[in-house]
A protein has these predicted regions:
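Acidic, proline-/serine-/threonine-rich low-complexity intrinsically disordered repeat tracts
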Residues: 7-9, 13-44, 48, 53, ...
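Serine/threonine-rich, low-complexity linker/repeat segments that form flexible spacers/stalks
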Residues: 29, 36, 40-42, 47-116, ...
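A surface/secretory-pathway sequence property marking extracellular, secreted
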Residues: 54-57, 61-88, 129-166, 262-316
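Intrinsic-disorder/low-complexity, polar/charged segments enriched in Ser/Thr/Lys/Arg/Asp/Glu/Gln
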Residues: 103-107, 121, 161, 179, ...
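Short, hydrophobic/aromatic beta-strand segments
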Residues: 117-124, 133-137, 254-260
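Low-complexity, intrinsically disordered segments enriched in Ser/Thr together with acidic residues
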Residues: 164-206, 313-353
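Hydrophilic extracytoplasmic domains
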Residues: 288-397
Length: 400
């Protein structure tokens, strides 16, 4: 059948995940905070002392297609100039809140001129303020399929371009069509702060653009105790993840402080201890709002893991400070239970409030994971046979 599959028929091979964040606080009075959206509540049923405030990071997972990685050495030519863009659009809110799991969706309806052969390819270029993986450790895009038959394999090139290379399905076929729906996630490295951004996708010089404002959450500040965090990387193939926590980003002096990080959903009780690194932030005013931190930058981060009172057990860590008087970043690398329904990591800072004398309080920040799915489908028709040649009519004899 040459019918175009619906998106519900598309395989779940290109799944996208977002990491959600919620805050919990002991306060003198109840704070007004936003309610989580439906997608976030799918990931975490958190009983917070006050209404939850949520953020989300994003993850894309696809089944590995080993042929894709080795596919760039085959023959074929760029057929981007054979593409007609029937429709293109970047669907998005005008304001994107990445920490709430919000993303854009690039949609293309394409047709291809005749003469496309196996091995030929076309490229989609994206502006560097977005990526297709979210917090996934592996970059993948979906195959274009007609039913279960692969029309083209997708791969991510080193420069970030998306390349689709056609299979033998297209040989001797015409009327080739493709429909793509790809999630685009704000890149926390290239967009470190709240800002106006133009998201642009390009095929053969033809641009599709959406202008948005990127707005990050600033974590939780409860009577001077402040925490922020994000799940920054997740690998579903080996069930590992990386979490970053900002401790005391507002840079107050907090006596008798304790930091506690814990996997509260999805902990894998396998006896393996997580890897925990603690960094003192040397330039607190330059911390990224996006909760992206290159901890290898020694001009910004000083590794103090061996200089503090750190205790690490299965699925959690605890840091005790007599006086917390600097900003810290905690990097937490761990396995998780791949069979769990959700993954949630909680960071809590407790101590004496710098606002109120002898007032003990705490602030918690939860990060979870949500999944999105990319879709791609297509079709092509067998060429119609040339009509049987009609014989020339018998010549009529000349009149006598």
């Amino acid at each position: 059948s040459n019918s175009v599959p619906t998106s519900s028929e598309a395989p779940s091979q290109n799944e996208t995940t977002q990491s959600a964040t919620t805050s919990e606080q002991n306060t003198l009075q109840k704070n007004e905070v936003s309610e989580p959206n439906k997608e976030e509540t799918q990931m975490s049923s958190l009983e917070n002392i006050t209404s939850p405030k949520s953020t989300i990071s994003t993850y894309t997972a696809t089944n590995p297609n080993l042929e894709v990685a080795n596919n760039e050495n085959v023959g074929g030519k760029d057929v981007s100039d054979k593409i007609t863009i029937v429709n293109s659009n970047i669907e998005s809110n005008d304001t994107i809140r990445p920490h709430n799991g919000e993303r854009s969706t690039l949609k293309y309806e394409l047709t291809f001129d005749e003469g496309v052969k196996e091995g030929d390819y076309f490229d989609i270029s994206l502006s560097n303020n977005v990526n297709t993986r979210g917090v996934s450790a592996i970059s993948k895009v979906p195959e274009i399929k007609n039913g279960e038959t692969i029309i083209a394999n997708g791969s991510i090139l080193e420069d970030g371009k998306i390349r689709y290379r056609f299979t033998d399905y297209v040989n001797n076929r015409e009327n080739i069509k493709a429909n793509l729906s790809l999630n685009l996630f704000i890149d926390p490295k290239t967009v470190p702060r709240d800002s106006n951004q133009s998201i642009i996708a390009t095929i053969n010089g033809k641009e599709t653009q959406k202008d948005v404002y990127v707005k990050y959450l600033n974590g939780i500040n409860n009577v001077g105790l402040s925490v922020n965090g994000s799940i920054v990387s997740l690998n579903k193939q080996n069930n590992t993840f990386t979490h970053l926590a900002y401790i005391n980003p507002n840079n107050f002096k907090i006596p008798a402080a304790t930091v506690y990080g814990q996997i509260i959903n999805g902990n894998k009780q396998d006896g393996n201890l997580p890897s925990v690194k603690v960094f003192k932030v040397l330039k607190p005013n330059e911390l990224n709002q996006s909760v992206y931190a290159d901890t290898s930058d020694t001009s910004m981060f000083q590794d103090v893991t061996n200089d503090i009172n750190l205790n690490v057990t299965n699925g959690n860590y605890q840091i005790d400070f007599d006086n917390l008087d600097s900003v810290y970043v905690v990097k937490f690398d761990s396995t998780y239970d791949g069979d769990a329904q959700s993954l949630t990591f909680r960071t809590t800072l407790s101590g004496l409030s710098p606002y109120y004398k002898d007032y003990y309080s705490q602030a918690s920040w939860d990060n979870g994971v949500l999944f999105y799915q990319n879709n791609a489908d297509g079709e092509g028709s067998d060429p119609k046979p040339d009509p049987e040649p009609t014989p020339d009519p018998e010549p009529t004899p000349d009149p006598e």
